Structure formats: structure tokens, C-alpha cells
Amino acid sequence: MKILVLNCGSSSLKYQLIDMNNEEVLCIGLVERIGIEGSILKHEKAGRDDKYVVEQPMKDHKDAIALVLEAVAHPEFGAVKEMKEIDAVGHRVVHAGEKFATSVVITPEVEEALKECIDLAPLHNPANIMGIDACKAILPDVPMVGVFDTAFHQTMPKSSYLYGLPHELYTKYGVRRYGFHGTSHNYVSQRAAEILGKDIKDLKIVTCHLGNGASIAAVDGGKCVDTSMGFTPLEGLIMGTRCGDIDPAILPFLMRKEGLDADGLDKLMNKESGVYGMTGISSDFRDIEDAAKNGDERAQATLEAYVKKVQKYIGAYAAEMNGLDVVVFTAGVGENGKAIRADIASNMEFLGMKLDKEANDVRGKETVISTADSKVKMLLIPTNEELMIARDTLRLVK
């Protein structure tokens, strides 16, 4: 069975075609600047070094997906001879609120439910829905599945997801912790159990998805019991441009002092904060590490604050689960930041985390980075959200 995995952003689209007989990626691609001048598709077929590139106007996601399907079935660069070889489409959907705790086959009722969640993810859900509609128009007979970033976290107990706010704000507007990166946390926790040869039901795992956006999850027996992101992807860790946890009273203070309105605050917290705002240098951790090595004190303090926040969450989740067996690092910083992983592991030996410095000297490769006698196993696992989406799609349409 061949499954097309789509991840639609507001002006971009990532895709992979995966042969589920052997979980082999047949082709991958990216469309950028949808609805903007300079639209471009970049497509790669497995086993080829050259790329197939198309630069032409794409007014909307329907135009973009039509070009994607042409590329997938291209006579030279395609991975199938004709579109009807695509057996199913798996869509990444950012926010399902409380409506879906697992992936679902997309029906008109599911689409209506997703539209009701637009207020919870105004930047992401409209693009996800546009991708679904475009696919239905071009591939009307192909089954489609929605895989939700929030679904994995729906197993959290109320004690983890309720905020200290008036209860009617939860009942009226759904104000609660939802969590994000769920597909990634799900994949790496399952993969960690496989690598260690353990039953995931017997493991207490903390998964650290450390990218430009970053979140941590407590996974007890294969189920998420807590996560650092909240009502939106802004809560939790210090991120590339997002502030993470701050005192909420800072916001009305800044509204008065800086004359900011709600949109101004939103921009400040989401686009101008995090390590970018703290250093004034970049949202790229490599740039900040270089500056820190060259004696930049703000860069040094920023990295220390970032590491300390990750350590706090690991410790808190170990306490919440009454134990800790595994810590997993994934995503851009987690997979490639050797020094940051080492700093996070430092001062954590009291929890049973002992880093193997030689094993940690690796980037982007599945590796056990803890010592043989470490009570808590630490692993580097590159995330694979596309494969997880394809697996869920296969399970539901088979």
C-alpha cells in the first residue's frame, strides 16, 4: 500500500510518499510560497541526487496539491506511474481540541469538527482543512485520514490539563492544556521501547522534542500523562522565538508600559522572544553556541536558562510519574546539539542519568547515549512524524 503524507502550512506544504509494504520513502518534497509571488515546488525521488523543481504561480493549496501529484507521478522523477496507485492520504492536523483522542478517517462530520477548532489554532487548522479539501477535489475516491498533534495528549488526567482559572472558561471556550508535537512524542517513545527491547507498558519515559518549537512529555506505560505545551504551543520551554513559561502578570504590565494591544503581545511572545529575544542574535542554537564560545555573556546566560528549564521539566515529570526509566532527545536541537544534551544530563545523576560522553558525540542517529550502568537510559532518536502518520493511515484504511 502506498500512502501520501501531507503536512499543510499556511503558505507551505511538505509531503512524502511511503510504500507501507517495507515502510520505504519513495519520494519527498516541499512546496513554498503558496498564494505568494515566487511559488516553488522542490521534489526528490529516492535514489536520485538531482531534484525536480517547478517554479510557477500557485494561488492556493488546490494548485499546490495538483502539482505535487504531478510530481509524484512524473515520468522521470515520479515514484508511481499514475495517481491511482496512491491508496490513501494521511493529513497532519495540528489541533483537534477534545474532539478526537486518536486518528480518524476523514468524513464530512470530521471536517465540520475541525472547523469548530479553528479558534484554537487559527494559523494552522485552516491550512490543514484547505489541504484536505484540495485532496478530496483531485482524489475523490481515495480514503483520507486525519492525524492530530493534540491526540496523543488526550490521555492526560484533569489534574494535568486544567488551569487555575474560573471553570466556566474551560466549559465555554475550552481553555485547558492540549499539548502539541504529539505524533513525535508518540513515535519516539514507542521507538525507545523497541530499541531497549522493553514493553512500553513497563516504562516511564520523558520525551524531549527540542527544535525551534520545543516540548517535553511524560509518557507512563505508553500514555501521555503531562506535557509542557499548553492551550497553545507558547507554554513551556524557552524556544527559538517563543518565550515559554512566564509570569502572566508581565502581560498587563507590558500593555501599560509599551502600549501593546493583544496582537502586539502575541507578536512579542511568539515571534520576538525565546533565545532570539534573549540574545538579540538568532533563533538558531548553532549561532548562539558560537557566540557563547566567543565570550558573549548574554548567549551564555541564555543557553544556561534553556538547559535549566529542560532539567526542571525532566525532574518534575520524574516526580509526577513516581520514577523514570528513559529520557529521549529528538528534533533539531535534541538530535544535533551534542553540547546541549551533555549540559542537560549534567547535575541529573541523582535521578540515575549518567551520560556516556563518547556515545553522545553523534548527530542525528539512533543512539543510546547513557552509560551501561546508568539507571535511566538516555537515547537520541530522530523523529519520524511522517512514518507515524502513514502507520495510522494504514491501520485505519486497511
Curated annotation (Swiss-Prot):
- Binding of Mg(2+): at which residues? 7, 385
User: What cofactor does this chain's UniProt record say it requires?
Assistant: Mg(2+); Mn(2+)
For this protein, the record's PROSITE patterns field holds: ACETATE_KINASE_1, ACETATE_KINASE_2
What's an example GO cellular component term for this entry? cytoplasm
Pathway info: Metabolic intermediate biosynthesis; acetyl-CoA biosynthesis; acetyl-CoA from acetate: step 1/2
List residues binding ATP. Answer: 14, 209-213, 284-286, 332-336
Q: Where, in this chain's numbering, is substrate bound? A: 92
This enzyme catalyses: acetate + ATP = acetyl phosphate + ADP
Q: Which Pfam families match?
A: Acetate_kinase (PF00871)
The active-site annotation reads 149
Matching CDD domains, A to Z? ASKHA_NBD_AcK_PK
Cofactor note from UniProt? Mg(2+). Can also accept Mn(2+).
User: What name goes with this protein?
Assistant: Acetate kinase
Gene name of the encoded protein: ackA
